[in-house]
Amino acid sequence: MTAAPQPLQPPVQPTAHASRGPARPPLDGRKAMIECRGVQKYYGDYHALRGIDLTIREGEFFSLLGPSGCGKTTLLRTIAGFEGIDGGVVLVDGRDMANVPANVRPTNMVFQSYAIFPHLTVAENVGFGLRRDPRSRAEKAAAVEDALGMVGLKGYGGRAAHALSGGQRQRVALARALILKPKVLLLDEPLSALDRKMREQMQVELIKLQRQVGITFVLVTHDQEEALVMSDRIAVMFEGEIAQLDGPEALYARPASRRVADFIGVMNFMPARIMGGGADHVTVAVPGFGTVDIPAANVSRADRGDAGPSIGFRPEAATLLPAGAEAPGRVTEGVIDEVVYYGDMTYYDVIMDGSDAYDGVPHEVRISMRNVFGREVPDVGTRVRVSWSPGSLVLFR
């Protein structure tokens, strides 16, 4: 009897998460900074938060990720104190936040719109929260300059806020939030208004800023790549519930359900039939792939409404080869149906031979290949071989 294949390993390609820098202390060794225990929220008859249980650690960069309307911003606003809750408990730094107003909580928030006052200077915007601070005017001015330096705007204090670019306004909003030295910084889709290049630049700057100040950052985003790049951990939310809470690599490589897998990046799905298995694997039959042993660590749950079991794999987990070429691992053949060029990467959509055996529908899989200068790109209609490893497959059952 052949040994079960090795579990799926985190992929090398999908994110720039390595930019988080050197290894950080384990999260389990840090105290809880935010705790949500059975948090419920209703808007009339609409159940926006359905018993959220969540712990966010001190100094963690944490993301709430999900589609529009999933409850992520509502959850952030309950932590900030802008929304009350209809059940459960929210604690910040061990203190129950019931009846604690937003302006007294040890949190501060950067809004999606930045909420910059256009008629004020940059310095006046950043120092707005210090109006009742007992420090002298000179001390406040020094604090403002320090905050501007922290976000890369040293010397910008005298500029008019309305004349700033989108990226500069975002930095001003960050400086204004951090000048009050909160224990938690809450970020409500702060990069969504920026163009792609500026957004990617600000992702790196936020990572560095969080590492510099060392406080807890909680980011709300609908952008999967943004969450994967920036976060220590991510909570994926659907319909007021947390579907999976994990680190970026685990979330991408071992999604807890087909819905999570489909939401995070690109995944190919094929119908499967369960044939048996053992303690360390499940044996499935997949049209075009044959009989495959899936490692137990790669078995996830299906979702309500799924037609039946299916297997999934990421585009980079397979290799495209010319017809007749020798290949390592298991091999399936097919015909290229579409070629999509992305500069450094090309995606090939391949209709797999025999993939219509179960449901009468020819199934297409997407394979990604790094572009190499001088290498010939196969055309639509070309017969190819697809090489893959059983350890790269996830079973949803």
Stretch-by-stretch model annotation:
Residues 61, 102-262:
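ABC ATPase nucleotide-binding domains
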Residues 65-67:
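The feature captures the beta-strand-to-loop junction immediately N-terminal to the Walker
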Residues 2-17, 21-22, 267, 277-397:
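Non-catalytic connector elements of ABC transporters
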Residues 86-89, 239, 271:
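Conserved coupling/switch loops of ABC nucleotide-binding domains, chiefly the family-specific signature
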Residues 55, 91, 385-387:
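ABC ATPase nucleotide-binding domain
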Residues 80:
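Helix-to-loop junction immediately C-terminal to a conserved catalytic motif
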Residues 88-96:
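Conserved ABC transporter NBD signature motif
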